[in-house]
Amino acid sequence: MGWQIASSRLTHDFSALPFKMKELTLLIKITPQVDGSGLRLILQNRFNHTALLFDELIVSHDEKMSDAKSITRGKQKQIAIVGNGAVHTDALPFEVIAGQPLYFRMRALQKQTYADFSCVYDETFYNAIMAGTKNAAPHLPHNWQARKGWFCISCLEVWTNKKTPIIELTGDSLAETGMIETGLIKQLLNQAVVVNTGISGNRLLHDAPQDGPLYQTFGQSLIKRATQSTDPHPHPIIALIGSNDLVLPLIDGQSAHELVTPGQYLAGVSQLKQILDDRRCPLILTTIPPFSPHVAPQQENILLDAQQRRLLINQELRRFEWVVDLDPWLLGNDGGLKEIYDFGDHLHLNAAGGMVAAQAIMQKLSQLGYEKSF
């Protein structure tokens, strides 16, 4: 018996765009990927200098919280998370079934600022809603095109006799939205745990631009994140990255001076591969998916150039056996995403697009022999 990660989603640095709440009620659905007889949470406050207090943290098997149990820390119901830190909650005996959602409600009675933020669009395995009052009884939303976000909860661990392998899904919003993650979890449930470290706006080569609060949430470059990771356990890492290296210069002034050539991108891929090889974490990289976002007329030539660089980069990436070619699945006749897989912005994937991308990734995992270890 031991503790095993059953669900994990990275909390992002929103210190440049913090949430200031007089009071807070959070309702979060998290679906464990491992069975267990007990649970505990990791609560993050890494991007806030001030401690956070939660006056209530409870868990239930249903959204109405009908069998709710208190989650404590140090046997106290009020939980403090130190500034720039993280805490484990106490262990709670509680039945956990892989694929069956758990519902967590958090309340804070005092005015606080929250900077550790996680979000999702696909509602299959995660969902959340927040309210700015302490006595709210919110209901989870059902709108796959709307962002659902929560604070502080980054990892659910369960007490189990199983040892389930970890697969990390990382990169940019193509990972973060949950569309591809959902497809992978559906195919790997009870075989492997998919953990998500995707960050919206993330790039392979460059850190977040600093010329706007939203841009500042885009995180450090994936190369830097891979270098600084403290995870000592080898595991496969699936990366969806590169779209923002090409597209961000179209919308952001600072990024316009960070145009990436195919040679620079491919050198960055080689560097990422070496970093992960040194960590004994096999890299499974996808080609850069098609994109055709709406741009102003004066930017059309810049967009065409970015699309051409995408084609040149992907042409070289296909030479590597550890690369998943998404173009046969996603590329439309107009050079952008197929309409049936388009989220609506000609850049991101809808649920159907996430499922076919996950299918392509699963085929590559099988070709590389990883299914034998699941």
Q: Where in the sequence are the language-model features?
A:
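Catalytic His-Asp segment of secreted/periplasmic serine-dependent ester chemistry enzymes
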Residues: 214, 247, 288-374
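Conserved SGNH/GDSL esterase-like catalytic core that processes O-acyl groups on lipids
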Residues: 156, 163-270, 294, 348
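A short helix->loop->beta-strand "cap" motif at the edges of active sites that frequently abuts
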Residues: 279-282
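Generic structural signal for well-ordered alpha-helices
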Residues: 269-273, 314
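Conserved acidic residues
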Residues: 100, 235-237, 321
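Hydrophobic/aromatic beta-strand patches that form the interior of the parallel beta-sheet core
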Residues: 168, 195, 284, 322-324
